[in-house]
Amino acid sequence: MRKTMIIPTYWCRKTGDPWQEGDAVYDHPTPVDQEGTLERTLVSMKQFSEKDFKLVILICPTTPEVEAAAYEQVLRIVGRAQLNAETYLFTAGDLREITEILRKAGLNDRGVQLLSMFGYSNVRNVCLLAASILTADAALLIDDDEVFELPDFVPRSLEFLGRRVYGDIVHGVAGYYLNSKGQYYDDVRPEPWMTYWDRFGCKARAFDQIIGSGPRLKRTPFAFGGAMILHRELFECVPFDPLVTRGEDVDYLINSRIFGFSFFLDNTCLLYTSPSPRDRQKS
């Protein structure tokens, strides 16, 4: 099975430069004068027992004004990490070149509008595009603020992909995150309003039922965009909805089910996530 891991990394204006009208909005992009968490993610991949995969790092600037600076930062980070993996840097400029090639091949204006690196859903779709270009049978979607703890993460995440389980072919596998406390719950500070809108409590109960109990593999009503493993039959049929600005991961799972694909969560497929407040600034 040909495997491609895609990691989008988000970059914004320098520290102290405010967000401007028209800039993309992400949770915690890295200012281009800082280095963020990407290197930590890449270094944690050195322990992998499975090295037969391609790695694509998708460089996502919040504005064209920081494209060049973001590229230089990522290039330095990748050079220091010295990963033993076939690695590609995918930039907004690369996407523009691909768009022009497809336009000349007959892609209409509506199709061209879908080729964008602005917003989470569009970024996820470019991740799928990169996997398709590299003829991957499996796309592993990972975020740049995660740390791998499992040396066998790659083969573990692919163990059931494409196989029949409970009468259905596994086309999508969701992993999950552990927070700084080693828990799979949202790492949030209690606020008074949560008494009346207990969304984190509801999520915790759902996580206990799906993540915290057996069996290892089970059908899931939720997935996490930075821990999704997709079979080629799925990602070349179902895209992320470009009009969904947040929650694109769960929306993708729902759309996958609508189109007849099965999505499961593997409760042994875990990553640690912890964006560094020292290295990040809110967009």
What are these model-derived regions, one by one?
Residues 78-129:
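Active-site-proximal specificity loops/subdomain of glycosyltransferases
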Residues 136-147:
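Short beta-strand-to-loop acidic/aromatic patch adjacent to the donor-nucleotide binding site
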Residues 245-252:
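Acidic donor-binding loop at a coil-to-helix junction in glycosyltransferase catalytic cores
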Residues 152-191:
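Conserved donor NDP-sugar-binding/catalytic core segment of glycosyltransferases
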Residues 272-281:
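Conserved small/polar residues in nucleotide/adenosyl-binding loops
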Residues 1-50, 57-60:
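N-proximal low-complexity "stem/linker" segments adjacent to membrane-targeting elements
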Residues 209-227:
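A recurrent flexible, glycine/aromatic-enriched loop bordering the glycosyltransferase active site
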Residues 136, 222-238:
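Conserved nucleotide-sugar donor-binding
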